[in-house]
Structure formats: structure tokens, C-alpha cells
């Protein structure tokens, strides 16, 4: 086998469709566009979502919610992630070094997800009420 002898498999490539090139091609004259009307003309397409003047669906439906500006800045950390950390005193820097919070985050909040059996101390981190109770039940403490 040589590079100059490699060819695609039989039927793998289709010839490009040439429209408007005679009656024998099956796509001559109107080039597969039919007769008259907006879609037969060049440039004859409406914008996406246009419904012929009827109020479009995306404008008929009500707006919902909003984009939180603090979402990117706050990272959630699970309790079972804290349990896996090798240190007993956990702060934001320790979470960053462990790769538990993204680089864009400025605040971390510990949430009640999973279990923690060992005593850890949180410094400068937020915690939900349930997470706080679980940490204190394991013998740890939370210093926000």
C-alpha cells in the first residue's frame, strides 16, 4: 500500500449536486426550488423565529428568572470533599490547592452533601446550617 494509491471506499463519496444545469440532471430550470414564492427567490428567507407577522413564540412566552452575577464568584464544596482533604484546618487557599474550587471563585460555601466523620476546622468559609451541624457533630468547628 502506498499513499498515492489510497482511495475512499466505493460509495463513500457523493458527487456534488449541480443545480440549474439542464433538464437531464433533474435539477434544471428552477433548480429544485419549485415555482414562485419567497423561498424560490435569491435572498428569500426570513430570520429565525419569524412567523409571518404573527407574534413569535419566543415573544409570546413570559420571561423567567435572571442571571445571577454572583454565581461565578461563589463555589459550592461538598462535605465528603472536605473529608478527603489531608489537612485538619481548611481555608479557601487549601480548597484552591486541592482543586475543589474554580479559579474564578472568590467565596466558597460548604453544603451538606455526603458525610464527614473526622474533626475539621473551617476558617473564612461559609457553610449551610446543615453542614455546620454535621461538622460540629463530628467534633469540628466553623469560624466564618
UniProtKB/Swiss-Prot annotation:
It holds the Pfam family Ribosomal_L27A. Residues 21-31 have a biased composition (Gly residues). It comes from the Bacteria. GO terms for cellular component: cytosolic large ribosomal subunit. Keywords: Ribonucleoprotein, Ribosomal protein, RNA-binding, rRNA-binding. The keyword rRNA-binding applies. Residues 1-53 are annotated as: Disordered. One of its GO terms (biological process) is translation. Coiled coil: none annotated. GO terms for molecular function: rRNA binding; structural constituent of ribosome. Belongs to the universal ribosomal protein uL15 family. Binds to the 23S rRNA. Part of the 50S ribosomal subunit. This is Large ribosomal subunit protein uL15. It comes from Laribacter hongkongensis (strain HLHK9).
Amino acid at each position: 500500500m502506498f499513499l498515492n494509491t489510497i482511495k475512499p471506499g466505493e460509495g463513500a463519496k457523493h458527487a456534488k449536486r449541480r443545480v440549474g444545469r439542464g433538464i437531464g440532471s433533474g435539477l434544471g430550470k428552477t433548480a429544485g426550488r419549485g415555482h414562485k414564492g419567497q423561498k424560490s427567490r435569491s435572498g428569500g428567507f426570513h430570520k429565525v423565529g419569524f412567523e409571518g407577522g404573527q407574534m413569535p413564540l419566543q415573544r409570546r412566552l413570559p420571561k423567567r428568572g435572571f442571571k445571577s452575577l454572583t454565581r461565578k464568584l461563589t463555589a459550592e464544596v461538598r462535605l465528603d470533599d472536605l473529608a478527603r482533604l489531608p489537612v485538619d484546618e481548611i481555608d479557601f487557599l487549601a480548597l484552591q490547592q486541592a482543586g475543589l474550587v474554580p479559579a474564578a471563585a472568590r467565596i466558597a460555601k460548604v453544603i451538606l452533601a455526603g458525610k464527614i466523620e473526622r474533626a475539621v476546622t473551617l476558617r473564612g468559609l461559609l457553610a449551610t446550617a446543615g453542614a455546620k451541624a454535621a461538622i460540629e457533630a463530628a467534633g469540628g468547628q466553623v469560624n466564618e
